[in-house]
Amino acid sequence: MTADEVGKNSFAKKEEQVLKFWKDNQIFEKSLQNRQGKTLYSFYDGPPFATGLPHYGHLLASTIKDVVGRYATMDGYYVPRRFGWDCHGVPVEYEVEKSLSLTAPGAIEDFGIASFNEECRKIVFRYVHEWEYYINRIGRWVDFSSTWKTMDASFMESVWWVFQSLYNQGLVYEGTKVVPFSTALGTPLSNFEASQNYKEVDDPSLVVRMPLQNDSASLLVWTTTPWTLPSNMAIAVGETLVYVRIQDKKSGEQWILSQGCVSRWFSNPEEFVILESFSGKDLVGRTYEPPFTFFQSKREEGAFRVIAASFVEESEGTGVVHMAPAFGEGDFLVCKENHVPLVCPVDAHGSFTEEIPQYQGQYIKHADKEIIKFLKKEGRIFYHGTVKHRYPFCWRTDTPLIYKAVNSWFVAVEKIKDKMLRANSSIHWVPEHIQEGRFGKWLEGARDWAISRNRYWGTPIPIWKSADGEILVVGSIRELEELTGTQITDIHRHFIDDLNIVKDGKPFHRIPYVFDCWFDSGAMPYAQNHYPFENQKETEEAFPADFIAEGLDQTRGWFYTLTVISAILFDRPAFRNAIVNGIILAEDGNKMSKRLNNYPSPKYVLDTYGADALRLYLLHSVVVKAEDLRFSDKGIEGVLKQILLPLTNVLSFFNTYAELYGFDPKSQDIEPAYTEIDQWILSNLYSVVGKVRESMSQYHLNFAVEPFVTFIDDLTNWYIRRCRRRFWEAEDTPDRRAAFSTLYEVLTVFCKVIAPFVPFLAEDIYQKLKLEKEPESVHLCDFPQVEMDKILPDLEKRMHDIREIVGLGHSLRKEHKLKVRQPLANFYVVGSKDRLSLLKTFEGLIAEELNVKNVIFYEEAPSFIYTTVKPNFRMLGKKVGSKMKEVQKALSELPNNAIDKLIQEETWVLTIDDREIALDGDDVVICRHTDPGYIARSSALFSVILDCQLREPLIVEGIARELVNKINTMRRNQQLHVSDRIALRIKTTEAVHRAFLDYENYICEETLIIAYDFTQDSDFQGENWDINGHATQIEITVSSIDS
């Protein structure tokens, strides 16, 4: 396969064929059947909403989940993979509201809750076919035939059981708290929902005068929320902070603020004078005039006083804090402690109520300008500017959140914090830092969870309440049927809101709330199986899950809610192992945006490059380590061309010559006569098996991918290249049989190693190689075991050194524009005695690989190369100080052998004036110098020198090799079969003609020429080539002459 074919979507087309093979032959189903009765490997899948299309984040998560599931299955486990759907909540409601224009306050109630909920039910699976297409197309195996849905009555009933269990443990309560609130949705949100969508915004920055009663001074109060000023109830100071009374020299006006904030607001000391200083404690209890008079009657209840608060700081503002207890969590708690009254003149949609007649009906953020205008007119504004800061936005509507005091139902998470931390300590996180970092810190700061929502399409909270406050919590459908005497088939709001319970003659009515949809997903381990009403054994055996995987944002979402509920119910984690992936960004580093069109569509990528390339690109990146990835389809194309295409070419190479020479793996009865390079590639193969197994046991997917990516390079750029002629041998020799047997074993084992990661290509390779009685699919095979008897560490080390030496030689040729096809005379290798003694048996291999006539090994550098060492002044300055000149002189006088020894030992100790100075590699700059005609390069272990002086015999041989290259290029371009013999016509210079004749046998054997003709015919129209500076025309035709 050529690079041109990459553009023809050949990989994607092959993948479509593999998908059909899997479907037609029910390979996924068979993979499950084959492991029935084996050890269960439990996996929980985070449910997506089907009201939106899948994006790269979903494809990434699907890839991670699929890799682990496929690997565990091949490793002998039974891995059920059941898909689930998140059906409730704001994402669904919001779509219906938009489509039906139900945006005005009260519009849903006017439309009818029953009608609204049924509309929600209709659109839940709007994009289910697209989801199934992308999940299947990415190669993920999952069971869509028995999906669970959060809107199913069975699921919702289990959620009720979970809630009743929490309530019975005394961990559910009703209360008023300040919580994140979405005015677009008219409902409170949880702390973790509020943390998901912070943005940089510009807000007003106001310093407001608050005149003290019975005093000529005003307190200077800073705020970024002018809309909260009508609700001001108190002012807070820090008891231990020092405050100052400042007087303006010109106007005589006096202000009070904290001493540490003076320079922020008074930059010119010539314009003011500090009259006195005192502690914050001295201000506590003082009264002041609020900026608005709407709640003057509250003064009698304790409003408009200065109170102390521990959170008051001097890092920003004035050290004097405006308190609106209904709109700040800290304000609420401190005001409650100090018996300051609570007012909340803002409705559920963020508009001022009739309590603020001046701005009644205005949306609070829109009222900011009017409020500032009024306060300026009243002379209350000391400073007006803007401030840029991070502010939370609603994760669904993308509108600013507010913090608002609301009545809500809470789970007392703070009471079970120790249980959650204990559960977290037993989870294996990838990456590891999530445990003590992002997730652990979130658990340490966990707040009580507001679980009630003033919404409609969700699981109703099963609380019935009497007029005197008595509560009944229902835990099952049967229990509700018995309490109401009604047969129940659905428990959504419009089916049960009107069901009243009468107990001991007292009526109970259901509270009008539904659960936060995160409560649904947190109950998923139990609710997916309708636990505890059925499937008890299966659910308990599968708990905790062996594995889950989601994005970094879920450390404050699904990972968190799973942990809260499992810690309460069972005092255990909900999962044992978790992979946390990062965020996929557009190539420019911004969020992917349809509006900005800054990323290629998933369908385009899958249709152009295929799923394997996308999977490997993602798995071989930082995104599987919870870091962000800038997505680039060029990166996917690189994976295709540099990793998958070379492996496909190896398969094509093997099949071509195996078919040509009739290689039959079943007929290989005796142990092949393996050469050292055969033993090396097999050793390398089984080392890779071990590395992949070890990495997968730790859930390090990127580490699992790395060794097999490197192995593909070893296989294609070393083993195949070094052994090509062995496969071309016309005679059936033991050496040819060993080469075929080796490569057959490599491909049949390696396709199983890569099967979890690139399942399509693995299947393609397997199908082209599998024997009749072997499993039907590579995914029905066992994952390879490590064959320790084939692992030869010393041989791998030696070959690594050889490749390093050859790599240095190739780098020299490339740097100095010396084609490898041009033979050179000598290649020198300088290294330690121990290493060189193991490499001398590979002298011929190095010579052939680098196209040199002689390879010479030296333990010390030869006379035509010398090394100098200079100080790295930037690094050495701190270490040697005034001794720099002496160090520079000592380094310049070191002889070659001493320098080589120091390089190998990687330690440098110089004695300057009886003082020992220890240097390391960063402290010096090593420079290699050679005589004219030689070029050199070094690594940590070796130095190599290439004799690049061209003599006549070498020039002639270079021409011959160039001819071979160009003729074989023409063979490939004309798509000749590897066995086709050809006739050659050539028009060229005398030098090329002479080189051809000198190397006739070599050229004819390498290109399968059986007849040739040199012509000077002026009408000859061959293909034009430059043969080392000689203009040449060449024509080749398939010859009919029997070879």
UniProtKB/Swiss-Prot annotation:
Its cofactor is Zn(2+). Monomer. Its EC number is 6.1.1.5. It is found in: Cytoplasm. A motif ('HIGH' region) lies at residues 48-58. A motif ('KMSKS' region) lies at residues 591-595. GO terms for biological process: isoleucyl-tRNA aminoacylation. Belongs to the class-I aminoacyl-tRNA synthetase family. IleS type 2 subfamily. HAMAP family: Ile_tRNA_synth_type2. ATP binds at residue 594. Keywords: Aminoacyl-tRNA synthetase, ATP-binding, Cytoplasm, Ligase, Metal-binding, Nucleotide-binding, Protein biosynthesis, Zinc. This is Isoleucine--tRNA ligase. Catalyzes the attachment of isoleucine to tRNA(Ile). As IleRS can inadvertently accommodate and process structurally similar amino acids such as valine, to avoid such errors it has two additional distinct tRNA(Ile)-dependent editing activities. One activity is designated as 'pretransfer' editing and involves the hydrolysis of activated Val-AMP. The other activity is designated 'posttransfer' editing and involves deacylation of mischarged Val-tRNA(Ile). CDD domains: Anticodon_Ia_Ile_ABEc, IleRS_core. One of its GO terms (cellular component) is cytoplasm.
